[in-house]
Amino acid sequence: MAEQLLPQALYLSNMRKAVKIRERTPEDIFKPTNGIIYHFKTMHRYTLEMFRTCQFCPQFREIIHKALIDRSVQASLESQKKLNWCREVRKLVALKTNGDGNCLMHAACQYMWGVQDTDLVLRKALCSTLKETDTRNFKFRWQLESLKSQEFVETGLCYDTRNWNDEWDNLVKMASADTPAARSGLQYNSLEEIHIFVLSNILRRPIIVISDKMLRSLESGSNFAPLKVGGIYLPLHWPAQECYRYPIVLGYDSQHFVPLVTLKDSGPELRAVPLVNRDRGRFEDLKVHFLTDPENEMKEKLLKEYLIVMEIPVQGWDHGTTHLINAAKLDEANLPKEINLVDDYFELVQHEYKKWQENSDQARRAAHAQNPLEPSTPQLSLMDIKCETPNCPFFMSVNTQPLCHECSERRQKNQSKLPKLNSKLGPEGLPGVGLGSSNWSPEETAGGPHSAPPTAPSLFLFSETTAMKCRSPGCPFTLNVQHNGFCERCHARQINASHTADPGKCQACLQDVTRTFNGICSTCFKRTTAEPSSSLTSSIPASCHQRSKSDPSQLIQSLTPHSCHRTGNVSPSGCLSQAARTPGDRAGTSKCRKAGCMYFGTPENKGFCTLCFIEYRENKQSVTASEKAGSPAPRFQNNVPCLGRECGTLGSTMFEGYCQKCFIEAQNQRFHEARRTEEQLRSSQHRDMPRTTQVASRLKCARASCKNILACRSEELCMECQHLSQRVGSVAHRGEPTPEEPPKQRCRAPACDHFGNAKCNGYCNECYQFKQMYG
């Protein structure tokens, strides 16, 4: 069996390379004698990437995943929206690691080199660092982290010096590689957060752990206790310039660590990992562990020094909102060829795939030999050359070239029934092929090649471009190998109607998309805005085997009811395609009533061809419905193209005339422009500091509510207050009531002590002039 032949770990594909890695690893560790922490010299800079598996068929892809990927951890983290929730970055996959208590070291080794820490190189380096080097800084950070933890805060627990020393000694013993019998029946003791922090300093490389916040029950899913493992561990014992800034990404679930690696050349997404969690309608930053109080105040600066931080625009929880989140850039595969195990494993997978295909083919032939009445599929006779029939999407066969199976059968039938067609011109006498129907029948298996039946069981040898019919009876569209022989529409019908729609899928074509508009992708949205006549006449040629250029989910509703429509005077085999008609038959009919249509009409379709008759009926029904309702049904009309440059999608008023993608780009551009403007304002404020201090040293007006500068040192009031007091005095002299002085408003500019006025839009004169000059 291929499942048994496929290695269950990367290092099993080439033991020589695995031995070479295990020999180099301990030699690369530098052990200073002056108390400095043990650390790697060069090998900590390597990174592993998994090969792509989409080129294999789904059945064999399942075998690869069973061999290498820890699907339970991956499914758990993805269901909790901790892993692969951001569509802007590449997907991460969890590789299997041994669960012997040393899984943290196994995961870190696999992320860098593709082998596990079976020789305990990292474990021994961790233990030696805690025993033989100066650990006062580690102990101090651990004590600070413990005092901030929930156990100390909520219980009021207090430790004396002896308690702290005992706890620290216990942590050092847990890191030992010589433990004869660990707790919980494991070979080694499990490690904790402080061990991850020490490991990041040994590797001189940040470690990011993706984990749930709560320890949950495996049966009920209820919360047991808070988890503190997840977060960011920076190698703070080293200057940032001496560290490798691409992090190691690990997953943690059910007390088990796994490496989370990217897929090589998987797509245009960014090779990065978000530094936030998306939880309860907001974005929450990942915790940075073991920071002192001064370091906690400069956390953002530390992240940018030890990581390559980039800002990514993502869609918010509210519709139409965009957020900028921080993400750490990940390294690409850089293992040298002499120690690259992924390439060897990929070559082995390709070899096993060929053997698996041959075995599957032999098993299928043996099953057919045991049951000769069972129809066989002539898929292995297909050639990679299209059929010569115009508009036919199928491929020719070795036995029927230059035609496909169905076109060859149709030609034979037309030639054998040509005299009958000349004598009987009516469409009732033509036993043609119905739209989307198949000529295959079990009685015809004895002679000649046949087309593939709609229930073909073996589809894994073909790519998605191989044109074959959907296995649903009467469906004219092409199957998808990932939908078990059904097309997208028929596969969607089989899904439970109560199943909630996935926001990442188009509701029309059911394809994974990065952005949708009202639940549908841009392609389907443009199709809904087009007129029915243009979409039908341009996308469906007259051949009964023509695969529609439009999406099947848009046309199946209108084509299926009419593909084999029977009337009282039409026989069951009277479903006729235009391609099945002969020149002799067309001589007795007239052109379609629709102007510019190249096909022929029939009396039962009121002079229209089949497609134009479908359009006629739909238009008639829509007109009748609009007359009854009094107003036309709401449609996507009067839409304008997106305002973005060289963008062919439709814009939306919700996105200021842009499509969703261009709106995010525009928002990002505005964000950078606003940041540049803010920096210009700061620089201008620094330039005006001497002048501001000089103005502040001048004498101010004696009135408490006035901040104006005196024009003359001999006076106590400014000119404005003098005029105001004179005006108030004259009014009081005339016996008129004194108007209350209106409260003055501060200048709108930040950090300005002057008062604004209405003429300057709320700014003071100086700030208004500055704003006019510099914008």
UniProtKB/Swiss-Prot annotation:
InterPro entries the record matches: OTU_Deubiquitinase (IPR051346), OTU_dom (IPR003323), Znf_A20 (IPR002653)
Name this polypeptide is given: Tumor necrosis factor alpha-induced protein 3
Phenotypic consequence of residue 100 to A: Loss of deubiquitinating activity
Main localization, broad class: cytoplasm
Family note: Belongs to the peptidase C64 family.
Record's note on what induces expression: By cytokines. TNF-alpha may regulate expression in the thymus. Up-regulated in presence of reactive oxygen species (ROS), like H(2)O(2), in LPS-tolerized macrophages.
Protein's organism: Mus musculus (Mouse)
Stretch list, region Disordered: 415-455, 567-590
Region called Interaction with ubiquitin, residue ranges: 157-159, 190-192, 224-227
A20-type zinc-finger residues: 381-416, 464-499, 500-533, 586-621, 636-671, 695-730, 741-775
Binding annotation for Zn(2+) 3: 506, 509, 521, 524
EC code(s) of this entry: 2.3.2.-, 3.4.19.12
Domain statement: The A20-type zinc fingers mediate the ubiquitin ligase activity. The A20-type zinc finger 4 selectively recognizes 'Lys-63'-linked polyubiquitin. The A20-type zinc finger 4-7 are sufficient to bind polyubiquitin. The OTU domain mediates the deubiquitinase activity.
Subunit structure: Homodimer. Interacts with TNIP1, TAX1BP1 and TRAF2. Interacts with RNF11, ITCH and TAX1BP1 only after TNF stimulation; these interaction are transient and they are lost after 1 hour of stimulation with TNF. Interacts with YWHAZ and YWHAH. Interacts with IKBKG; the interaction is induced by TNF stimulation and by polyubiquitin. Interacts with RIPK1. Interacts with UBE2N; the interaction requires TAX1BP1. Interacts with TRAF6.
Catalytic reaction list: Thiol-dependent hydrolysis of ester, thioester, amide, peptide and isopeptide bonds formed by the C-terminal Gly of ubiquitin (a 76-residue protein attached to proteins as an intracellular targeting signal)
One GO BP: B-1 B cell homeostasis
Region ranges (Required for lysosomal localization and for TRAF2 lysosomal degradation): 682-775
Keywords recorded for this protein, A-Z: Acetylation, Apoptosis, Cytoplasm, DNA-binding, Hydrolase, Inflammatory response, Lysosome, Metal-binding, Multifunctional enzyme, Nucleus, Phosphoprotein, Protease, Repeat, Thiol protease, Transferase, Ubl conjugation pathway, Zinc, Zinc-finger
The keyword DNA-binding is annotated on this UniProt entry: yes
Molecular function GO labels: cysteine-type deubiquitinase activity; DNA binding; identical protein binding; kinase binding; protease binding; ubiquitin binding; ubiquitin-protein transferase activity; zinc ion binding
Subcellular location: Cytoplasm; Nucleus; Lysosome
Region described as Interaction with RIPK1: spans on this chain: 386-445
Region (TRAF-binding): 58-300
